């Protein structure tokens, strides 16, 4: 397991890096005192989960020996790595000007320029020990996150999870949906007394819908639309794409079509989840 220690000058992108690591499955803690690193690692060792901790000038130990002692007390299960982020002086000044945030050392009656220089001196023990130093001066937020994924996971983009969810319009549109498709115009199994108590997961309902050309056309055109834009969505620094399929009650048509789309993209090697809001509400 990895214990990733993220440090660097304020404004260099530590918060961005920590969020990217969290998206990669790391257990993340912001500004943990160095002396508590071994305790955190021992707590997480049983859970077999990698961790990432940010350290900035506010929680730097008084001497380098304290940091070295904390590193030596880590459980053997953890492999510590130190990532140090930096940016040139003018870039840091511009970022502080843009965000209008206070520098952590600004309460010491220092100008912003002096605070940045003082911070460099205080962080030098960590910088000199870093396994990887990244200059973020010319990087966007997305580029920094992408670079970390490439270095740590060996692939450029994070894996997008496609979520296909069915719902009933009479219960309201899901607020987490990226795309909403209305299938109330398709033939409705509800009007067949034998099919009414069933759901879109049952074979007789599936057979009923499968007999209609318009159902096939809708599924084909919807998946073609998603396939067209999926490459761009996968490189858009997002974790989930939620596609909501709605019919009147959320029981028959929307369930069947959500499952058909989920099966199609799952067969193409995509990371897919499916859920059915109305059916989940009916569970005891």
From Swiss-Prot:
Residues 266-284 are annotated as: RNA-binding. GTP binds at residues 56-59. It comes from the Bacteria. One of its GO terms (molecular function) is RNA binding. Keywords: ATP-binding, GTP-binding, Nucleotide-binding, RNA-binding. Coiled coil: none annotated. ATP binds at residues 8-15. Modulates the synthesis of GlmS, by affecting the processing and stability of the regulatory small RNA GlmZ. When glucosamine-6-phosphate (GlcN6P) concentrations are high in the cell, RapZ binds GlmZ and targets it to cleavage by RNase E. Consequently, GlmZ is inactivated and unable to activate GlmS synthesis. Under low GlcN6P concentrations, RapZ is sequestered and inactivated by an other regulatory small RNA, GlmY, preventing GlmZ degradation and leading to synthesis of GlmS. NCBIfam families: PRK05416.1. Homotrimer. Belongs to the RapZ-like family. RapZ subfamily. PANTHER family: RNASE ADAPTER PROTEIN RAPZ. This is RNase adapter protein RapZ. It comes from Shigella dysenteriae serotype 1 (strain Sd197). The gene is rapZ.
């Amino acid at each position: 397991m990895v214990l990733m220690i993220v440090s660097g000058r304020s404004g260099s992108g530590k918060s961005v890096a920590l969020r990217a690591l969290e998206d990669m499955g790391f257990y993340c803690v912001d500004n943990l005192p160095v002396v508590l690193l071994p305790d955190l690692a021992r707590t997480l060792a049983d859970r077999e989960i990698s961790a990432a901790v940010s350290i900035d000038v506010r929680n730097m130990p008084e001497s380098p020996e304290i940091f070295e002692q904390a590193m030596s007390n880590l459980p053997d299960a953890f492999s510590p790595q130190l990532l140090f982020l930096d940016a040139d002086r003018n870039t840091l000044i511009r970022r502080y000007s843009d965000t209008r945030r206070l520098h952590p050392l600004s309460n010491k009656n220092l100008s912003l320029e002096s605070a940045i220089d003082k911070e460099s001196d205080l962080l030098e023990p960590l910088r000199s020990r870093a396994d990887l130093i990244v200059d973020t001066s010319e990087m966007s937020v997305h580029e920094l996150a992408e670079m970390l994924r490439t270095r740590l996971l060996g692939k450029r983009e994070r894996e997008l999870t496609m979520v296909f969810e069915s719902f009933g319009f009479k219960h309201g549109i899901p607020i987490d949906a990226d795309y909403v498709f209305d299938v109330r115009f398709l033939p409705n199994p509800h009007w067949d007394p034998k099919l009414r108590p069933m759901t879109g997961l049952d074979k007789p309902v599936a057979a009923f819908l499968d007999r209609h050309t318009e159902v096939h056309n809708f599924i084909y055109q919807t998946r073609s639309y998603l396939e067209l834009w999926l490459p761009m969505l996968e490189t858009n620094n997002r974790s989930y794409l939620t596609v909501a399929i709605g019919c009147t009650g959320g029981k028959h048509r929307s369930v069947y079509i959500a499952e058909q789309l989920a099966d199609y993209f799952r067969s193409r090697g995509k990371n897919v989840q499916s859920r059915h809001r109305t059916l989940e509400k009916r569970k005891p």
